[in-house]
């Protein structure tokens, strides 16, 4: 497992392709991955089999997400987003993704974080709960797949410190 700030072009291509495998990609994924604060990758036999990222999204994006979720929280208080989380099916349920995320989170230096996931993604919802994220607001329609709904999760720095 690696957490990187800078990646090669080949790694960036593999990262973007793996995120696309998870069905979470929109146009411009490679460029957005290039701008991410930190990229995390799980590599097996020289291939990326899992991805996660710590992002510092624009204020306008954070405001849009929190508004869609009907959240009363201040989006400015959540500067980091945990996202682009995907792991190939044969490698799931082995704790690898939790370890990768545990390696990524210290880069946020204790700041509040948010994440979104499809409401139907029970595995991701469970993992977010396991790493001390809580559901916030109401589910809302996915921009990428109108047949799906999305749920906002937040992790507050003071709650994390109190529970550790």
Task: Go through each PLM region and give its residues.
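Conserved GNAT acetyl-CoA-binding A-motif
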Residues: 108-119
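Extended, composition-driven regions rather than compact fold-specific motifs
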Residues: 35, 42, 125, 153, ...
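Conserved active-site alpha-helix within GNAT-family acetyltransferase domains
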Residues: 119-142
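Short amphipathic alpha-helix that is part of the acyltransferase structural core
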Residues: 1-31, 39-49
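C-terminal "cap" of GNAT-fold acetyltransferases
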Residues: 141-164
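Conserved acyl-donor/pantetheine-binding loop and adjacent beta-alpha core of acyl/acetyltransferases
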Residues: 50-84, 142-146
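Conserved acetyl-CoA-binding loop-helix of GNAT-fold acetyltransferases
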Residues: 84-87, 93-106, 126, 130
């Amino acid at each position: 497992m690696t957490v990187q700030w800078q990646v090669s072009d080949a790694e960036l291509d593999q990262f973007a392709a793996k995120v696309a495998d998870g069905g979470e990609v929109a146009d411009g994924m490679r460029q957005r991955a290039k701008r991410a604060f930190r990229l995390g990758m799980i590599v097996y036999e020289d291939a990326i089999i899992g991805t996660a990222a710590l992002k510092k999204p624009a204020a306008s994006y954070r405001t849009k997400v929190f508004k869609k979720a009907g959240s009363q929280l201040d989006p400015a208080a959540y500067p980091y987003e945990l996202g682009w989380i995907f792991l190939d099916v044969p490698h799931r349920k082995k704790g690898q993704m939790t370890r990768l995320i545990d390696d990524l989170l210290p880069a946020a230096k204790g700041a509040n974080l948010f994440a979104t996931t499809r409401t139907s993604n029970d595995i991701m919802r469970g993992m977010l709960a396991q790493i001390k994220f809580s559901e916030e607001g109401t589910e809302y329609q996915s921009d990428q797949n109108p047949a799906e709904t999305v749920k906002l999760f937040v992790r507050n720095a003071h709650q994390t410190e109190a529970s550790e």
